[in-house]
């Protein structure tokens, strides 16, 4: 008798995706982040659902409802902090996952990569609208500053901003619609993640060498299920350490002050995971130019497959490209640091240099290094 998991219409899908899936035998721990992202997403949806049961999306009560969750709801404080720090964990996993894809040439799977870029945009949008919900000072001013960027669009800009606001400033209508977006977007992310996986399973996983591994596949279960469980335990450990020992480490103290349209915080800045893009935005002394640079800093990922000039897929055997990759990582860390600093003398120029280097590395230096490596290999 054939096993039910191979015949039942629903179980067959699960079986083909997580049990009998042929997987390369040599994928490293960098391949763990996909499953960790799935775990983060489920965790965020569940904690978010429980928070939504007690939250009120209204300018007069939003801030108080967060206080109510933390003080009066059973274990509300841990749900709230798991959700807030879970977002940070989500982005850590996301950036590691993308870095892995860039390093090992996963962008060769173009559909999977493109869905991934769309997923990144959706996750960033979700995190942004979610940050507005507590209705603290940084929530309010962050929403004002970022939505205002759309006014840089010629001709329709101002109309567009007021349409998004639902009025002439960030107010009740804005908060209500942002809550609606924040509720629906994670389910869109979930659907996109399934499509992402669907396209990945059409081709099979890449591996560190970048060489086809059809002749050396092993079943996903038990080998990688156990490996994923280890990764999940480490992620949960890190999240619990952060949530229970330093819940406000990554947050902004300004957000513990209720939103006040009459008082601007000294330094308006987004959460840490957006600081690199914020630094690029600020480094251009022109509104439209800054907005375009900001958009392009993320959208550039969609062009990575076209910028791949090497005859090899992975960077595993390409020392020049490896050096430039780690230079890009260092550059992004520099941009993240600059994004959190005030707009003053040393920071401005460092941010401008780092922004130029970011685009230069991706658009010029890495493709040229790949061509040089091809020549050295006499290809």
From Swiss-Prot:
Q: Which UniProt keywords apply?
A: Electron transport, Heme, Iron, Membrane, Metal-binding, Mitochondrion, Mitochondrion inner membrane, Respiratory chain, Transmembrane, Transmembrane helix, Transport, Ubiquinone
Molecular function terms, GO-annotated: metal ion binding; ubiquinol-cytochrome-c reductase activity
Gene Ontology, cellular component aspect = mitochondrial inner membrane; respiratory chain complex III
Provide the cofactor list for this protein: heme b
Family, according to the entry, reads as follows: Belongs to the cytochrome b family.
As for membrane topology, the entry says: Multi-pass membrane protein
Q: Which PANTHER family does this entry report, sorted A to Z? A: CYTOCHROME B
Q: Which Pfam families match?
A: Cytochrom_B_C (PF00032), Cytochrome_B (PF00033)
Q: How does it assemble?
A: The cytochrome bc1 complex contains 11 subunits: 3 respiratory subunits (MT-CYB, CYC1 and UQCRFS1), 2 core proteins (UQCRC1 and UQCRC2) and 6 low-molecular weight proteins (UQCRH/QCR6, UQCRB/QCR7, UQCRQ/QCR8, UQCR10/QCR9, UQCR11/QCR10 and a cleavage product of UQCRFS1). This cytochrome bc1 complex then forms a dimer.
Species annotation: Balaena mysticetus
State the superkingdom: Eukaryota
Instruction: Please give the biological process terms from Gene Ontology that the record holds.
Output: mitochondrial electron transport, ubiquinol to cytochrome c
Instruction: Tell me the residue numbers annotated for binding a ubiquinone.
Output: 201
Compartments annotated for it: namely: Mitochondrion inner membrane
PROSITE patterns on file: CYTB_CTER, CYTB_NTER
Additional information: Heme 1 (or BL or b562) is low-potential and absorbs at about 562 nm, and heme 2 (or BH or b566) is high-potential and absorbs at about 566 nm.
Q: Where are the membrane-spanning stretches?
A: 33-53, 77-98, 113-133, 178-198, 226-246, 288-308, 320-340, 347-367
Q: What is this protein called?
A: Cytochrome b
Task: List the SUPFAM superfamilies.
Answer: a domain/subunit of cytochrome bc1 complex (Ubiquinol-cytochrome c reductase), Transmembrane di-heme cytochromes
**Which amino acid positions bind heme b b562, per UniProt?**
83, 182
UniProt cofactor note? Binds 2 heme b groups non-covalently.
Question: Which InterPro entries does the entry link to?
Answer: Cyt_b/b6_C, Cyt_b/b6_C_sf, Cyt_b/b6_N, Cytb/b6-like_sf, Cytochrome_b, Cytochrome_b_C_euk/bac, Cytochrome_b_N_euk/bac, Di-haem_cyt_TM
